[in-house]
Structures are given as C-alpha cells and as structure tokens.
Amino acid sequence: MTPALKSTFVLAHRHLLGIEGLSAADITGLLDLSEEYVELNRQVDKKRASLRGRTQVNLFFEASTRTQSSFEIAGKRLGADVMNMSVSSSSMRKGETLMDTAVTLNAMHPDILVVRHHASGAVELLARKVDGSVINAGDGAHEHPTQALLDALTIRRNKGRLEGLVVAICGDVMHSRVARSNILLLNTMGARVRVVAPSTLLPRGIERMGVEVARDMREGLDGADIVMMLRLQRERMNGSFVPSSGEYFHYFGLDQKKLAYAKPDALVMHPGPMNRGVEIDSIVADGAQSVIREQVEMGVAVRMAVLEALARNLPNA
C-alpha cells in the first residue's frame, strides 16, 4: 500500500501559467512535494490515486518528446485518464481557431489541460475559456514553469539550497522560455543569476530582470556553482544570429576548458534536446559534473507534484 504524503501543500492558484506570480513559499511547497514523488518513483509500486476519476488532456501545438511523455507518465501514475491530443490530426489543421478548440474541449469537461503552444501568451488566453485547471508546458519564448521547477529541484538536491548560488545561464537566452522561467524562479529564491551569450542572443534590457550579463564564457562562468546550457533555437530565429555552429561552439560551447572557469564542483545542466558539438561537448554532457539525466528524472516528480497541488483545488477534491 502506498503511504500517505506528508506534504499537504495546495497551490493557491487555479492554473500554473508561469513562475511569475509564484511566491517563494509556493515554489518551496512544490519542491517539497516533488521530493516525496522522487522517492515514490523509485519504488516498485509508483501509483497513487490522487487523480482517479479525473481527465487530463495533453494539448501540444508544438512537438515534444520529453515534456509530453513526462506529463503523461505523471498523470497516469496519479490515476488520471490521460488523453494526448495530436494537433497534426486535429481540427486546428482544418482552420479551427485556438478559442474554438478551447470551447470544444471545455464541453468535454476535462479537469486538467496541459498545453504547449508556439505563441507567447496563447496558454493564458486558452485558460480564460476553460473551467478546468491549465498547466503551461511552454508558450513561445515566454515561460516553461515546470522546467524551471525541475531544474530548481535538481539543484537543491545536489547543493542543498538555492539561495546564494551563482547560476550561469549560457546560450540562446533571447529565444528561451526556459531561461526566462529560471531567471524568475532563481531570483525569487535568492540565487545570483548571470546570463552568458553573444549580444545577438541577448534580449534588449535583460538586465531589468535582475541578472548580471557576460558576453564571454571566461567572465560568465567565473565562480559559477551551476552552468546551465541552452540550445540554439533556430526554429524561432528569423535570420542569422550566429555566423556558424562551429564558430558558436568555439566561443560559447561548453567544453572541459571552459568548464574549468567555474567552481570545481559546479553542476552542468541542459533542458534538452542537446545539440552536441554546438552548445555542449559530449565529454562534458556525459561527464561526472553533469546532472542532465537527473533533470529528466526530476521532471516526472515535479509534474506529479504540480498535478497533485492543482488537483487539491478542484471541485470535490
């Protein structure tokens, strides 16, 4: 028999649309609940009945392997009826608008919608039209809250804290929803955030988000506790932002030489998918300081915690 959870945390929001708006207490509550699911997921019996009788729809307008499968596993382990909606075979391909889709889905009374969309703000717009809870699984270059939470959980489990750590976020910051959500979370939790990228991949006014800015890896990684690499998101680029992949790797790709600028016990992270030989070297990605595979494991636990925390707010929960 699965033991009862110790955490009674309830997310005081109907939806999880972003890290923005979450307090330090919210983040800590979700991370603490996630810790319990890490342990559960390492048992033979990984099931709980928290979402039994609930319907979870995964609605992905952008292709995703890790995030969609992670949410599917999370929902099924909690006992939900999980439906994956393929946009490529849906009415959206026939001209139906996002709002039409929202209204249609709402008529089916789903309890939780997990939504990924290529346009920033689209998930929030959809959330206004449905009665159930909505989780943002990534919207354009805006936010990806569960990725930031799983990154925070990975860091906290390895370093024991978030406060006071120096976190270097390196690469395509301009097009990265992961960077934005991580910056918001890490600042809220008292970490010191540094973004490292060529000028062409830095959003104008990024300093206003409370980060330090470095334009070369030696300066950016100096004294870093965490080195978080981002992939080049060419699908969001209109035009050339870097001369070539080879030149980009030479200056901004993480290899053993550049990693040596960070602290000796620095963690190497990457949200995936990785472009090996572009933003990160295979030796580093698979090396002793890498926690990239652990991030994937933490993703399932975090998404179970988010689903649980939102489900506790649902009617008749």
From Swiss-Prot:
Family, as annotated: Belongs to the aspartate/ornithine carbamoyltransferase superfamily. ATCase family.
Keyword check for Lipid biosynthesis: no
EC number in record: 2.1.3.2
Highest rank taxon of the organism: Bacteria
Subunit structure: Heterododecamer (2C3:3R2) of six catalytic PyrB chains organized as two trimers (C3), and six regulatory PyrI chains organized as three dimers (R2).
Residues binding carbamoyl phosphate, per UniProt: R66, T67, R116, H144, Q147, G272, P273
Described purpose of this protein according to its UniProt entry: Catalyzes the condensation of carbamoyl phosphate and aspartate to form carbamoyl aspartate and inorganic phosphate, the committed step in the de novo pyrimidine nucleotide biosynthesis pathway.
Pathway(s) it belongs to: Pyrimidine metabolism; UMP biosynthesis via de novo pathway; (S)-dihydroorotate from bicarbonate: step 2/3
Name of the protein: Aspartate carbamoyltransferase catalytic subunit
HAMAP family given in the database record: Asp_carb_tr (MF_00001)
Gene (name only): pyrB
Any single GO BP term: 'de novo' pyrimidine nucleobase biosynthetic process
Residues that coordinate or bind L-aspartate: K94, R177, R231
Keyword entries, A-Z: Pyrimidine biosynthesis, Transferase
Gene3D superfamilies assigned to the protein according to its UniProt record, in alphabetical order: Aspartate/ornithine carbamoyltransferase
This protein's GO CC annotations: cytosol
Catalyses which reaction(s): carbamoyl phosphate + L-aspartate = N-carbamoyl-L-aspartate + phosphate + H(+)
Naturally occurring in which organism (per UniProt): Rhodopseudomonas palustris (strain HaA2)
GO MF annotation: an example: aspartate carbamoyltransferase activity
Pfam families per record: OTCace, OTCace_N
InterPro entries reported for this sequence: Asp/Orn_carbamoyltranf_P-bd, Asp/Orn_carbamoylTrfase, Asp/Orn_carbamoylTrfase_sf, Asp_carbamoyltransf, Asp_carbamoyltransf_Asp/Orn-bd
